[in-house]
A protein has these predicted regions:
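Transmembrane-helix bundle segments that line or gate the permeation/cavity pathway
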Residues: 2-24, 64-75, 80-83, 90-221, ...
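Long, contiguous internal "core" modules enriched in hydrophobic/ aromatic residues
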Residues: 35-40, 44-64, 155-354, 451, ...
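Transmembrane alpha-helical segments in integral membrane proteins
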Residues: 99-111, 177-194, 280-290, 360-376, ...
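Extramembrane terminal tails and long inter-domain/linker segments of multi-pass membrane proteins
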Residues: 1-46, 147-162, 192-228, 301, ...
Length: 464
């Protein structure tokens, strides 16, 4: 028997799925990804999807215009429920963007190669989600044209923002998050923009991509500065994954409202944000790989890893639900106990049971490898989880406000047509921006995939 032959009773070692499909070269990777932008026709599916999302964006514009004309009374908010769909949607959209930052920055610093195929469109998802989230604080105030009052700028009247207000904290957190994410995304695009510039046949495309590439020539000096800047921004973006949704959670945690005033909110909100963010990445990645034949670049390894991250963060979210109830009863605070009972037996209990089904029970299927490797089931589960995370925000915001300290101040919340139209409009805006992004810029990082080709070929030779 050869010394290199394994013993007969040795357990079979399961090989991981590749991060990149076999047989690819530098040229084939570039051709496949760049062709989606430069040469592939739009197709009836893209045109139909864009038309639908554009229609929803028009619904959003009409909803905001009617809001400005008539005021926030067109929504279902009232006294005491002054925070309705606007804040629910704001928190939900901000959370969705977190997976893009985690994939781009934290996994980059941890040298996780499987991020390479998904980081570009995950970063774009972050920017589009932040854009959708930014709409709601503005229109929630009822006077969006007065939004500049929230910025600290020198004025002759000497008016300064109230820095003890969580609304001001949100302005700084979200604007910082959006700025760093935009810089991180754009710097990563520079080598690919130069590739598109050099391969474009259309003069207009050459001018646009040439201007955006900012003179990139691929010299050693360019690559050195690019890698230094990318590493620096990854280091800056990493704490933002924790800080942004922590600040958003302070909107609730610093208040004395029962159900909000709890210390579990910061880690609970961060875990929930990553949870919903990875669900949205799966929601985008699965149709994208199917529509453009990118199965060799977004492989089962990527889907399996994202499902595992969803399972892990879902367990943290479930722990947060448990701690909420435990602390309510352990503290003996009768207001917190009553609110916990209202979530189980009150007028909005069906929303609470729905979120438990979506966020805790359904994701337990991800323990099974067959489920994680079933693409259609993963897609459905990602939609279910995103729905559950929206319901979680609704339960936190609305139920806590409907049952306050004084029974005479209790109320009911009934969303109106304009609440739903604004939500659907932002979903349309998000999807429309994704449709434009996929056809205007490379959805997968060409330069990083080229590096992966070299690394995969070296590892193949080492195994042989």
């Amino acid at each position: 028997m050869s010394v290199t032959q394994p013993p007969l009773n040795a357990p079979e070692i399961r090989r991981l799925d590749p991060v990149l499909g076999p047989g690819h070269t530098y040229a084939s990777v570039t051709d496949k990804i760049a062709s989606v932008v430069l040469t592939r026709p739009l197709g009836i599916g893209w045109l139909a999807g864009f038309a639908l999302t554009f229609t929803l964006v028009m619904v959003l514009f009409i909803s905001i215009a009617w809001l400005i004309i008539k005021g926030v009374g067109i929504w279902g908010i009232n006294i005491p429920i002054g925070w309705g769909f606007a804040i629910v949607n704001f928190v939900w959209w901000i959370g969705i963007g977190h997976a893009g930052t985690l994939i781009s920055a934290i996994l980059f610093l941890l040298n996780q190669k499987w991020r390479t195929s998904i980081n570009r469109f995950a970063e774009a998802m972050t920017l589009f989600a932040v854009a959708c989230a930014g709409i709601f604080p503005l229109i929630h105030t009822g006077r969006p044209w007065m939004a500049y009052y929230m910025f600290p700028y020198p004025s002759t009247m000497g008016i300064w923002p109230q820095f003890r207000s969580p609304l001001i904290w949100d302005v700084f957190a979200v604007s910082t998050y959006g700025t760093v994410s935009l810089l991180f995304w754009f710097i990563g695009l520079l080598p690919d923009l130069a590739t598109l510039r050099d391969r474009a046949k259309n003069r207009f495309q050459q001018l646009i991509y040439g201007a955006l590439a900012m003179g990139w020539r691929g010299s050693a000096q360019h690559w050195h500065r690019y890698q230094s800047a990318y590493l620096l921004l990854a280091g800056l973006a990493t704490p933002l994954v924790l800080s942004v949704h922590t600040v958003v959670s302070f909107d609730f945690a610093v208040a004395i409202v029962p159900g909000w005033h709890t210390t579990i909110f910061p880690p609970y909100f961060v875990a929930g944000a990553i949870y919903s963010g990875f669900a949205m990445v799966l929601t985008i990645a699965i149709p994208l790989r199917k529509a453009y034949g990118l199965e060799d670049f977004i492989t089962m390894r990527h889907l399996d890893n994202m499902a595992k991250v969803m399972l892990a963060t879902g367990l943290i979210v479930a722990y947060g639900y448990f701690v909420e109830f435990f602390m309510a009863f352990y503290s003996g605070n009768k207001f917190d106990v009553f609110l916990a009972q209202q979530r189980l037996h009150g007028p909005y209990s069906h929303y609470y049971y729905a979120l438990i089904l979506c966020n805790i029970l359904t994701p337990q299927l991800l323990w099974f490898e067959k489920v994680r490797r079933n693409v259609a089931l993963l897609f459905v589960m990602s939609l279910v989880i995103n729905t559950g995370m929206w319901l979680e925000r609704f339960v936190i915001v609305v139920i806590s406000l409907t049952r306050d300290f004084v029974p005479s101040a209790w109320g009911r919340y009934q969303p109106t047509f304009w609440d739903f139209s604004t939500l659907l409009g932002t979903l349309g805006l998000f999807a429309m921006l994704l449709f434009l992004f996929v056809r205007g810029l490379p959805a997968i990082a060409i330069s990083e995939m080229r590096e992966l080709v070299g690394q995969e070929s070296h590892s193949d030779r080492d195994r042989k």
